[in-house]
Regions:
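Extended amphipathic alpha-helical scaffolds
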Residues: 1-45, 49-50, 117-360, 368
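Glycine/serine-rich anion-binding loops at beta->alpha junctions
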Residues: 3, 73-83, 389-391
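Extended, low-charge hydrophobic alpha-helical regions
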Residues: 7-10, 57-59, 159, 355-357, ...
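Residue-level signature of catalytic and energy-coupling elements of molecular machines
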Residues: 28, 78, 102, 163, ...
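Short, ordered loop/turn segments at secondary-structure junctions
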Residues: 38-40, 50, 89, 103-104, ...
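Active-site cofactor/substrate anionic-group-binding motifs, chiefly glycine-
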Residues: 44-73
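Elongated alpha-helical scaffolds
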Residues: 79-93
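A structural-propensity feature for long, helix-poor, extended segments
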Residues: 101-149, 217, 320-351, 409-479
Length: 510
């Protein structure tokens, strides 16, 4: 093994500035959108930090660590994916400057970790205020802070209400999972305001026979993951037929087998059958004559969700059907929306599965709405169990910055300069918010810093006009969990990268 492409420690932080500059314009209500052409030829229009980074094809290890950073924040918290990358990039940029000034990397690392502890303590002790978790208005304000900056800002309140309702239906935070307890079904037709949550499931399927019933009240439902057709031999078989009537007998034997299978099903009097596999035309005909509707070739995941809606098991063999395998629903209907047919199965109140229906005129908007809904659900899930709120609009970041400056005065060594440099780096969030509003950055940051130094820690940036406002008065709040996790991940990532002095790329000898 030989090593090539050795990079110096002070050089490999440059890529973090590139990533930071890419995401800066996506922060806040005045954020810009990115148009991404992915490797499958699809066009994605979004300002979601994690979505943008996820689609980048980058081989640089530092850039990959920042992308992983954003992904971690998205999985654990669901919000703050842009913030965490901007802070981490600023800390790496600062590390580069300090290393060039001959500061020891271990001294910088220790200062970073101390500053992190100080910041987390300050958020919990001085900035966090209690709030009524059962007050829907306060919860919606918190979710709006996250969702209001997205592409679908016009419909942000509706998405907030959907997110909160989805989480409140299942109060157990750890048990709530999208795609496990909830499904998001996207329907590309006009009428965003028609988006809603239903107690059941929606599948993009129609009945398999045009004359079968498309509307049934209190249906008895059977779920299968097997075929309803003549069972073919697993081994290859050849038949020689010398007489014409023998061919008719073979066809009749197949038909009798399918009629026998249909009669086995008929004994349990189901109104509706869902199966993951195929149903032959002969079986469809006999089931239709028996007044049984059939929907075939559904996804395995949808079949499992149906099982939760109707409270029954999925049957693998028709010969093993039992009475307990027949489930019940409140209502079944097939509706034509746009050019497609959608199957609605509405469960009873005890149903363990819900579907969030999203309507929008285009698939691009639907995809962005889904991303925003995931963020909203994540924030709502944390908010319901949160112990407090902190001011948004960069107020928290500026307050932490001022606190670190005050703490730096107790040091008389190198930590004095490093603490002040870290404090300056944390101003990246309010500074970026002001930049994106197109107003004088220096003037506004000095004004904000002045307000903060006068103990007005609630003052931050109003993201649409760039004005200095009292965040508590206008209800601009964030969750301390989001900010604390963003700081932890950003500082710890920067600390790990500080301990790397070389990047070595290995290649095998020929």
């Amino acid at each position: 093994m030989v090593f090539s492409n050795v990079l110096n420690q002070s050089n490999y932080y440059d890529v973090s500035e590139l990533i930071s500059s890419l995401l800066k314009t996506t922060l806040g209500p005045r954020s810009m959108l990115k148009m991404i052409l992915d490797n499958q030829g699809r066009v994605i229009i979004t300002n979601d930090g994690n979505c943008i980074l996820r689609e980048l094809d980058i081989k640089n290890p530092i850039a990959k660590s920042l992308i992983e950073l954003s992904n971690t924040q998205d999985i654990e918290i669901g919000d703050g994916t842009t913030t965490v990358v901007l802070i981490a990039a600023e800390l790496l940029k600062l590390a580069k400057v300090l290393l060039q000034k001959r500061y020891n990397s271990i001294v910088i690392l220790n200062s970073y970790l101390n500053a992190l502890e100080e910041s987390i303590f300050f958020i919990k002790d001085s900035l966090s205020i209690p709030f009524a978790r059962d007050n829907s208005k306060d919860l919606i304000k918190v979710i709006l802070t996250s969702i209001g900056t997205k592409l679908v800002g016009r419909f942000s309140r509706m998405i907030c209400e959907l997110s909160l309702k989805a989480v409140k239906i299942n109060q157990k935070k750890d048990f709530f999972k999208v795609n496990t307890n909830f499904k998001i079904e996207k329907i590309p037709v006009f009428g965003v305001e028609k988006s809603k949550i239903i107690a059941g499931i929606v599948i993009s399927k129609d009945v398999s026979h045009p004359k079968m019933r498309r509307k049934i009240s209190n249906p008895k439902i059977l779920l299968l993951d097997c075929n309803i057709e003549f069972k073919k031999s697993e081994m290859r078989s050849n038949f020689e037929i010398s007489e014409g009537h023998r061919w008719k007998e073979l066809i009749k034997a197949e038909e009798d087998q399918e009629i026998y299978i249909c009669n086995l099903i008929k004994k349990f009097n189901p109104d509706l059958i869902f199966t993951e596999k195929n149903v032959s035309d002969i079986a469809l005909h006999y089931l239709y004559k028996s007044n049984i509707s059939v929907i075939r070739r559904i996804r395995k995941s949808d079949n499992e969700r149906l099982s939760k809606v109707i409270g029954s098991n999925i049957v693998s063999s028709i010969e093993r059907i039992e009475e307990d395998d027949i489930g019940r629903a409140k209502n079944f209907s097939v509706r034509k929306i746009g050019d497609e047919y959608f199957t609605y199965v509405i469960g009873f109140d005890f149903s363990k599965f819900k579907t969030i229906l999203l309507f929008a005129p285009s698939k691009d908007i639907l995809d962005e709405m889904e991303r925003n809904l995931h963020d909203g659900i994540s924030v709502a899930r944390i908010a319901i169990s949160s112990q407090g709120l902190i001011p948004g609009g960069g107020a928290t970041d500026m307050a932490i910055s001022n606190n670190l400056i005050n703490k730096s005065r107790i040091f008389k060594n190198n930590n004095f300069y490093i603490y002040r440099a870290i404090a300056s780096s944390l101003e990246i969030i309010p500074r970026t918010l002001v930049e994106n509003c197109g107003v004088n950055v220096i003037k506004k940051i000095v004004e904000l810093k002045g307000n903060q130094e006068n103990k007005f820690c609630n003052y931050g940036i109003e993201g649409r006009g760039g004005n200095i406002i009292d965040c508590r008065k206008i209800g601009l709040f964030e969750l301390p969990e989001v900010k604390i996790n963003a700081y932890k991940v950003a500082f710890e990532n920067a600390s790990i990268l500080l301990k790397i002095d070389k990047i070595l790329k290995g290649k095998a000898l020929n």
